Amino acid sequence: MFKKVENKVHFPQLEEKILQFWNDNKIFEKSMKQREGCEEFTFYDGPPFATGLPHFGHFVPNTIKDIIPRYQTMKGKHVKRYFGWDTHGLPVEYEVEKSLKLSGRYEIEQYGIDKFNEECRNIVLRYTKEWKKIITRLGRWVDFENNYKTMDLTFMESVWWVFKTLYNKGLIYESYYVLPYSPKLATPLSNFEVNLGEYKEIHDPSLTIKFKIKDKNEYLLAWTTTPWTLPTNLGIAVGKDIDYSKVLDQEKNEIYIIGTKRLNHYYQDENKYVIIEQFKGEHLKGIEYEPLFDYFVNQRNKGAFKIHTAEYVTTDDGTGIVHIAPFGEEDYQILKKNTQTDMITPIDAECKFTSEVKDFEGLFVKDADNKIIEKLKSMNLLFKRENYLHRYPFCYRTNSPLIYRPISSWFVNIEKIKEKLIRSNEQINWIPEHLKKGRFGKWLENARDWAISRNRFWGNPIPIWKCSKTGNKICIGSREELEKLSGQKIIDLHKDKIDKITWPSKYGGTYVRTSEVLDCWFESGSMPYASKHYPFKDKDKFQNIFPADFIAEGLDQTRGWFYTLTILGTALFEKTAFKNVIVNGLVLSSDGKKMSKSLKNYTDPIQIINTFGADALRLYLIMSPVIKADDLKYSDDGVKDVLKNIIIPIWNAYSFFITYAIIDKFTPNNHVNLYKTNILDKWIISEIESLKQILNEEIDKYNLTKSIDVLLTFIDKLNNWYIRRSRRRFWKSENDNDKTDAYETLYYTLKNLMLMLAPFIPFLTEEIYQNLKTKNEKESIHLNDYPQSIKELINIELEEKMNFTRKVITIARALRASHNIKIRKPIKTIYIITKNHKEQNTLREMTEIILEEINAKEIKIKSNEEELVTYKAKANFKELGSKLGTNMKSVALAITKLSNEDILEIINGNKHTITINNNTYDITLKDIILERHERKNLKVINEDSITIGLDTLITEELYLEGLSRELIRKVQNLRKESNFNVTDRIILYTNNDEILTKIINNFENYIKTETLAITIEINNKKALKTLELDEEISVNIGIEKCLN
């Protein structure tokens, strides 16, 4: 019936065999087919870019994305799993720019947008084969053939529908705004894209500049850390309620205005200045000053070069006075509110100064800093130069500094729907839960309008056409609309194709498309609709699969995909786009740093799989903090430990069963009688039924951490308790009912455990199932239903009793170990002290098990410790000090002289009276500090409410019995070294040794039974090995297979 199982197995090879089995027999396809027509479970797969290979950061969510759909499929649901590709956007363009050696927008336009886009199309799916191979090798089942791509015509058309729907709801607008801008990509980024990048600590020049007040020989000392913005200075800001001082600089003989609190930063010596006047910032409002440069003097008549008050000004650093230019968001808002100045942005697409700033024309703004400083110095307007260390955002694609600049952009009005977004978040089950109100919730509360346009080429074009004469806008939501208006057939919606599409306006001009493309995050956020070509296809079915039941991605997506899904789902349908989400953390290198190919600080994940297996890697990842959105410091040894401590023990349990089942020709019956009489059988059956109940509850709640914890706890119970304690039931030669019960119980347990583990470790469970399944069972473990609990088999009382028994045994074994008393050495007595009568009854019921596990001859169950310890007492000064006053010393001395009986009286809740100088004092338990002293030959340990004592006095009989057990262990090792089968009978040879003779005379039958020895012969001529039984005794023994 069963195939023989090797004890040693190479798990990666086994997994390759299982992959072949799944592929040859189309098991994934069959799992999908058999659930057609069943309840739909909707899962969205966030689209990765295929311009790079998958790394550890992808392995975590892809493991989660496999576990949940496998589980839900086994629960009878139909779970469609389509892989998707993010094919547009900055990552793709940046790769093409590098490969074509192009730099910046101008060179791309010179190269040709049509050719550039074609190159993007060619490389965008560069690594799809590698992705498929690696994700499949991880064990993930997903449909790669019916994938979606954001560059597909149908996908792009649905994105246009999303855009137009928002446009018609008044949620899309065009405006100038200060945005983070990537000079290398020549495009603005959204605020959440900035958070996807890195903030680095950089040194920038910190300048204090002299601004001359108009018509006065007085200067404002203003502070900036962005010298390159000074040529576009249009105003100065002060704090309305901040105190300012007008001072005379004694050395320079000039008058300066500065924040009073900042004087000591600029003047360490108070004798170097004289305070002329002090006032609030409100006093300065509206005062005019002379511009630093003459580039934009024409803006004075529009309100430029005046002092404004602003709440963001502080005296924490600088001078308490800041310069205003249109390159800061707060600055821009002040200018917009208080002036009519033009939008001054004298920099090009690559952030180089234009001819408007003639002195620095052609210089990249950050490179112009030093030249601007030199210019100001020559004009005697530089008061002080320092260096300023601060955190600054870098582009998440080019790793270069971002520049904040005003730019015309298209926005989604988040402010209008913010309250609805917060309500949508309430509908989401976040794992871990703290993200709902924490990272994601706070992000929503502070969300700004979303800049969705990019000044790029390879993306989904913004579907707005403007009249060249009137500026009138038409928003297009489908190909059909565009075809009707233009009279042209539309087969591609990319920029290089549709920018050529125009039509005459009834106002006399021409309708021309706005030049920008959509942020690729708008596309991935549209994935629920666009991947289904909604609303152009199967519109009536869509509401049945929206919102998604489940999604999973990394923590960074709280400000990425999770965010855009929530925005668009709320804006379109006023509900969230997903109900449940598992969020994983970052996988870092073992030193806590970001994994980096250049640093070579991690092992290639495929090499890990080829060494330890995908099951071991999957388990390692989902057992780690990364599953709870925390960071994981990855370690190869961690995966190795999972193989050693979990995968191999599962295999060993399976191997043990198969080995003896083959010997005894055990044939499983699908209708096993589960109502057993053996307490171990009843216990493990109850445990596995409880496990089924807990797992179904926890995985239904997406709590993989708890799920894996209870699974691993059960595996430990199965291996280290049930199988270990049941071994003799399988070893014995006779086939009685107890042996049959043991086989049936272990078979049932193993098979059900494999079914429960199947979504987590799909390879190992498949291999074991293939050998355990009976003739008429499902072809694959993954075609089965997930096990449901048989509640009448759950015996909570028995589980509690066994758990308590194991706890007592664990404490007692720890006590033996702490005193170097080997478990094979028997002891006379174990004392167990507990006042709990229920626990005492359990101990009596489990006496046989406890004696075997502790290797003791008798057990004494008591309510108090008198037989184990004697007591001494000391005064509890903290308690007694306030009561005793001057008699404290005398009472404390009397307490140290209390007898053991006196102290016992106090322990039992009585008062003990001490008389000092005719004064009586009633001493209670809280007045003393107890000291326990072990009685002779006893070792005692106390944990929680349990005290355990071991009688360590070893008689000769106990000593010999311990040696007999050591002898048995040595013989068993010899059997293994000789590669004997577990059923092979042997002849045991010994020399004529006095101690050995004593051992054999006392324990011959026991030794024969345990080692399968037919006879024990004294034969000095045989090749014997010298082996140590303990530190002082060595014996010579040998074994030979019995051929009869």
Swiss-Prot record:
Its EC number is 6.1.1.5. ATP binds at residue 597. Coiled coil: none annotated. A motif ('KMSKS' region) lies at residues 594-598. Keywords: Aminoacyl-tRNA synthetase, ATP-binding, Cytoplasm, Ligase, Metal-binding, Nucleotide-binding, Protein biosynthesis, Zinc. Its cofactor is Zn(2+). GO terms for molecular function: aminoacyl-tRNA deacylase activity; ATP binding; isoleucine-tRNA ligase activity; tRNA binding; zinc ion binding. Pfam families: Anticodon_1, DUF5915, tRNA-synt_1. One of its GO terms (biological process) is isoleucyl-tRNA aminoacylation. One of its GO terms (cellular component) is cytoplasm. It catalyses: tRNA(Ile) + L-isoleucine + ATP = L-isoleucyl-tRNA(Ile) + AMP + diphosphate. It comes from the Bacteria. A motif ('HIGH' region) lies at residues 48-58. It is found in: Cytoplasm. Signal peptide: none annotated. Catalyzes the attachment of isoleucine to tRNA(Ile). As IleRS can inadvertently accommodate and process structurally similar amino acids such as valine, to avoid such errors it has two additional distinct tRNA(Ile)-dependent editing activities. One activity is designated as 'pretransfer' editing and involves the hydrolysis of activated Val-AMP. The other activity is designated 'posttransfer' editing and involves deacylation of mischarged Val-tRNA(Ile). Belongs to the class-I aminoacyl-tRNA synthetase family. IleS type 2 subfamily. IleRS has two distinct active sites: one for aminoacylation and one for editing. The misactivated valine is translocated from the active site to the editing site, which sterically excludes the correctly activated isoleucine. The single editing site contains two valyl binding pockets, one specific for each substrate (Val-AMP or Val-tRNA(Ile)). Monomer. This is Isoleucine--tRNA ligase. It comes from Borrelia duttonii (strain Ly). The gene is ileS.
